[in-house]
Amino acid sequence: LAILFETEQNPIPEGANAEFVLTPDGRKLRTAWWHPAASATRGTILVLHGRAECIEKYFETVSELRRRGYSVVTFDWRGQGGSTRSLRDPRKGHVDDFSEYLVDLETVMREVALPRCHPPYNILAHSTGAAIALLYAARARTQVERMVLTAPLLALSGGRTHFLRVVTGILNYLGLGEMYAGPFRGDLVQLRPFEGNRVTSDKRRYERVRELIEAHPELGLSGPTLAWVHSALRAAEFLALPEFAERVPLPVLIAMAGQESIVSNRAIEEFTLRIKTVGNVRIAGAMHEILQEDDRYREIFWAAFDAFIGEPDEAWRTPFTSPGAPPPQA
């Protein structure tokens, strides 16, 4: 497909559909969806990416979900991947507020998931995407039934969340919100060498992403802006409020990486204890990007995923024609 990209090591899963959809505030989002490999669907999984990621990075995950009988919907958040970039410098990861991401998710639900794929609808989300998923779950009306989150951004590793929120808030107030938050000079984070990385121990999967971005640098991203970091930390502190626990009405499973060095596992554990509908599993040895990890860690994750999402009622096992289309003839 013209708006999806592949490499020899990362082919587009068969049956792909892709299109751009427009948000109410005028942002163009790149979306993709697949129906399952079998002739019936167990429902739909929405895959929500982390910061600086793109649809292509999740092709392997898409294939694994399709083999399990799910339709899959995924998309690039505004400001990254193939969606509308937020600033004149397209390599800066920027939003003014995380509520903009909720607009993206609601748009994709309305324009892609609901009209093209069958219920039940569940979410699989990573890091930044996981934080957005929790914000979405707290809204009064959501069609999502369950969520599986990997390494959610509930706080930064090292306990710097509050301090950095205050500092970035001051700088943002002074009009510096579009500056890089750190020593970035437009270098694409996906092109950094494998050695010393903090996201995966699997060199093959790491190099697969590097190869993709080398071939299609327009999908890559550099560092976040001060405004992005401030908004992310504000969202994390909101999720940590005691009253937020009463606003998550659906079951959530969180997968924590045992060798996590980006987000705070302690914050995840505290979050799990506060909310009775949330459970967690720690995958010893895994690094931050569990879905991009070595198979021995991913197998643990997928076993937990399968047990948690479970087998829907037979009533949901419908042919994967688009909702609203005429039923297939016997």
Features from the language model and the residues they span:
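Catalytic active-site module of serine/aspartate enzymes centered on a nucleophile-bearing elbow/loop
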Residues: 284-330
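Alpha/beta-hydrolase-fold enzymes
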Residues: 128, 132-220
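Alpha/beta-hydrolase active-site loop
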Residues: 93-113
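Short beta-strand/loop motif that positions the catalytic acidic residue
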Residues: 248, 254-256
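Short alpha-helix in the alpha/beta-hydrolase fold that links the catalytic acid
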Residues: 250, 263-273
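Active-site glycine-rich loops that stabilize anionic/oxyanionic intermediates
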Residues: 42, 48-53
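Conserved alpha/beta-hydrolase
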Residues: 55, 62-88
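An N-terminal hydrophobic leader/cap segment in hydrolases
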Residues: 1-22, 27-37, 330
